[in-house]
Amino acid sequence: MDEYSLQPARIADARRLAVMSQELVEAGLRPAWSASRITWHMRHPESIVLVARQDSSIAGFAIMRYGDDVAHLNLLAVDPAHRRRGVARRIMTWLEETALTAGTFIIGLELRATNEAAHAFYATMGYRELGRVSGYYQGIEQAIRMARDVRTGRDAVPGLKQPAP
């Protein structure tokens, strides 16, 4: 993998992350992830906003919120110029190891049902489909709900409770 460093996002990164979310995750939807919402997560003690940097540019990022029993991956995005270089895998591995260390053993997430590449990626990371939610994305698009138990790396927990995003 190219040289990428993982680090907590800085407040100055919030606008760039909001643009990345709008272009890479929320395309075709009303933007839900504003710079102020991302900044809130940066400041919240139960959230992490993690960026992968190559030199001074942001190659990818994730936002995850920790609950007592379950962590919720809110966003994961990698700039197209940095895809297929292990950036998403490295971010997810870091988040999973951190959750395990914190005693939060389940990570849950939702993704757009039309995002076949993301679905395949999460499946290779050991996430299992728990179900589908019609109209999850602003009443427009179906979501796939997935989860992984990071203790075993392979088993999702049926009936998973999701913390508030």
Model regions and ranges:
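Conserved catalytic-core motifs of GNAT/GCN5-like acyltransferases
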Residues: 108-111, 123, 128-145
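Conserved G/P- and acidic residue-centered "switch" motifs that form tight phosphate/ATP-binding loops
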Residues: 86
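Acetyl-CoA-dependent GNAT
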Residues: 4, 8-83, 92-98, 102, ...
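Short amphipathic helical patch at the helix-1/turn junction of helix-turn-helix
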Residues: 78, 112-113
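Short glycine/proline-centered loop/turn elements that form peptide/ligand docking sites
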Residues: 92, 115-118, 135-140
